[in-house]
Design a protein with these regions (language model features):
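Catalytic machinery of carbohydrate-active enzymes
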Residues: 1-317
Length: 317
C-alpha cells in the first residue's frame, strides 16, 4: 500500500504530525509512506524512522523568486516527483490551499482531508473526496492522529509517540539551551526574565547556551549573553539536524512556543515551555514527566516559576 501524507509547515506543526506517522507505521508496517513537507523542515521528517520517502517542497523560496528559471525547473521536478507514482491513499494533514493543491495533483485512489470547519481556507476542502472531524479537533496532535484513524477506519489510541531517532543523553551535561527566539512577537518572553534565568542557571553551576536562527535573534542572543556574564555562550549557527543532536546532549531546554522547543519535547529532552501569547494546550511532550509547560494566560510567566520548574527537572535528571 502506498500512502502520501501532506503537512507542509510550520515547524511545530510538522513535529506535531509525527505521532500520526508512528500510528500509520504501526497500523500498516508494510506500507510505503511518502511525506510532502516544506524543504525547511524536511530534516525533521527524516529523523522519523517510519517514513520511506520525504518530498521536500520549496514553496516559500519559489514564492520569493517567481520569475527565476530555476524556480520553474524545480516546480516541474516537484510535480514529476509527486505524480510519478500512484498512491492508494493521500491524506491532507494541513488543510490549506497549498496542501490541497498537492492532494488534488496527486494520483491517489482515495483523498482524505480535514472537515471544512478545520480548513484554514475555503478551497482547501474541495480537493478531497472524504473529510474527517476527529475528537479533540482543536488540538494539533489529537487532530492529526484522529484524522488518520478515521482514514484507516481503525482505533489508534495510546500516548503520542513522535518516533524520533535522537534519544536524550544529556544527564551529565552542564549546558542549558535557551530558546528565546520566535517569528511571532506576541510569543516572546521578556529579556529581563531571560537574564534573570540565565544568572540563576549559572549560580547552579550550569552554562546557558543561547540559540538563534536569524540576524535579529543573534543580536538578542549576544545581548542576553553579555548581560548574563562570561559563563553564558551564544550557540554557533546550526542546521535542524545539528540542533536535534545538540538538544539531545544538553541537560535542559527552556524555550518559548517555537519549533525547537517542540522538537526538544518530542525528543524526550527535559524541557520547560513558556507560553505567553499562545495556549499551553498545544504542548505535547514525548515524556510528560520530563516536561513543564508554563502558561501565562496572555501574560508572561514569572521568572521564579521557571526557576522552580528547572529545579524540579534538574533534580530528576
Amino acid at each position: 500500500m502506498r500512502i502520501l501524507i501532506v503537512r507542509l509547515s510550520a515547524m511545530g506543526d510538522v513535529i506535531h504530525a509525527l505521532p500520526a506517522l508512528t500510528d500509520l507505521r504501526r497500523a500498516l508496517p508494510d506500507a510505503h509512506i511518502t511525506m510532502a513537507v516544506d524543504e525547511r523542515f524536511a530534516d525533521i521528517v527524516r529523523l522519523h524512522s517510519g517514513v520511506d520517502r520525504v518530498m521536500a517542497i520549496a514553496l516559500k523560496r519559489w514564492k520569493g523568486q517567481p520569475t527565476a528559471m530555476q524556480t520553474w525547473r524545480e516546480i516541474k521536478a516537484a510535480l514529476h516527483a509527486l505524480r510519478q507514482q500512484r498512491y492508494d491513499l493521500a491524506l491532507d494533514l494541513h488543510g490549506l490551499n497549498k496542501s490541497a493543491a498537492l492532494i488534488w495533483l496527486a494520483r491517489a485512489g482515495l483523498k482524505i482531508g480535514p472537515h471544512p470547519s478545520l480548513c484554514g481556507e475555503w478551497l482547501a476542502s474541495k480537493a478531497c473526496e472524504r473529510h474527517g472531524l476527529p475528537e479533540q479537533a482543536h488540538l494539533p496532535v489529537p487532530r492529526m492522529r484522529g484524522l488518520l484513524a478515521l482514514a484507516l477506519k481503525q482505533e489508534l489510541g495510546g500516548p503520542a509517540d513522535f518516533g524520533l531517532r535522537h534519544a536524550w543523553q544529556g544527564a551529565a551535561s552542564k549546558d542549558v539551551v535557551l530558546l528565546h527566539g520566535t517569528s511571532a512577537a506576541h510569543k516572546l518572553w521578556p529579556e529581563s526574565h531571560w537574564i534573570e534565568t540565565g544568572c540563576f542557571l549559572i549560580a547552579q553551576g550550569l552554562r546557558p547556551v543561547l540559540a538563534w536562527g536569524s540576524a535579529a535573534e543573534h543580536e538578542r542572543a549576544v545581548r542576553l549573553a553579555q548581560a548574563m556574564g562570561p559563563q553564558a555562550v551564544v550557540a554557533p549557527p546550526c542546521s535542524i539536524l545539528q540542533w536535534a543532536e545538540q538538544l539531545a546532549r544538553c541537560r535542559l531546554v527552556i524555550g518559548v512556543d517555537t519549533g525547537l522547543t517542540h522538537l526538544a519535547a518530542a525528543s524526550a529532552v527535559p524541557c520547560i515551555a513558556l507560553f505567553v501569547g499562545t495556549s499551553a494546550r498545544l504542548f505535547t511532550p514525548q515524556e510528560p514527566r520530563w516536561a513543564r509547560s508554563l502558561d501565562g494566560g496572555g501574560q508572561s510567566p514569572a521568572a521564579e516559576q521557571v526557576h522552580t520548574a528547572a529545579q524540579e527537572l534538574l533534580a530528576m535528571s
